[in-house]
Amino acid sequence: MAQQGSGYQARYKRILLKLSGEALMGSEEFGIDPKVLDRMALEVGQLVGIGVQVGLVIGGGNLFRGAALSAAGMDRVTGDHMGMLATVMNALAMRDALERANITAIVMSAISMVGVTDHYDRRKAMRHLSAKEVVIFAAGTGNPFFTTDSAACLRAIEIDADVVLKATKVDGVYTADPFKDPNAEKFDHLTYDEVLDRKLGVMDLTAICLCRDHKMPLRVFNMNKPGALLNIVHGGAEGTLIEEAQ
């Protein structure tokens, strides 16, 4: 449940939190772990409790991966549409977890799904956010060939968020995959161009270029670290910050 009142001043007024679908699996190999949903709902609720406005984008990789089936012969557009539906399923699950924690949440889908979700409308989304309601943006951009990372950056720009927070399984951006390379070194700070030049694979090219062109800061952090999200909102240096060159 969101707790009202805090002695701390939040650094960010409005954030866009990007969660991977895989994050919802927890220790499972497929699907959604209810314990993970409840923990994430609690962390989001802490932000709402101190007055932070939260937009949320969730991937669909825990349920479906269109790109993989495309490589196996499925039509790419069909696969991407199926992937969008997977993100809607995750969004509905997250909304349910938030509401069980007494946090008002709205799902807005880029694909019209009357009776299931609200259709995405920027002005309505911003009104919901201003009313301290969590807005979950589903179905990506509504177009094939665009990732949910690109959708997250696009929505962040549209709703005038202060920062994009990308939750991952590692505590930032490394020179290589730290799970595979024990010598991988972590970056505390990067510019957009450094990410592109080094081909670090933080997000796809479209997402990084969107952030760069609109001067949208991006922080990559470990969602499995308790309190990391709240620490970031208070100005803590969790993970890796990516922004324009100073």
UniProtKB/Swiss-Prot annotation:
The reaction(s) this protein catalyses: UMP + ATP = UDP + ADP
Class of the enzyme per the UniProt entry, highest EC level: transferase
Activity regulation remarks: Inhibited by UTP.
Binding site for UMP: G60, D80, T141, G142, N143, P144, F145, F146, T147, T148
Major localisation: cytoplasm
InterPro entries in alphabetical order: AceGlu_kinase-like_sf, Asp/Glu/Uridylate_kinase, Uridylate_kinase, Uridylate_kinase_bac
Top-level taxon: Bacteria
CDD domains associated with the record: AAK_UMPK-PyrH-Ec (cd04254)
Entry binding sites for ATP: K18, L19, S20, G21, G61, R65, T168, Y174, D177
Pathway terms, separated by semicolons: Pyrimidine metabolism; CTP biosynthesis via de novo pathway; UDP from UMP (UMPK route): step 1/1
Subcellular location as annotated: Cytoplasm
Recorded GO CC terms: cytosol
A Gene Ontology BP annotation from the UniProt entry: 'de novo' CTP biosynthetic process
GO molecular function: ATP binding; UMP kinase activity
Family: Belongs to the UMP kinase family.
PANTHER family to which the protein is assigned, alphabetical: URIDYLATE KINASE, URIDYLATE KINASE PUMPKIN, CHLOROPLASTIC
Function: Catalyzes the reversible phosphorylation of UMP to UDP.
Protein known as: Uridylate kinase
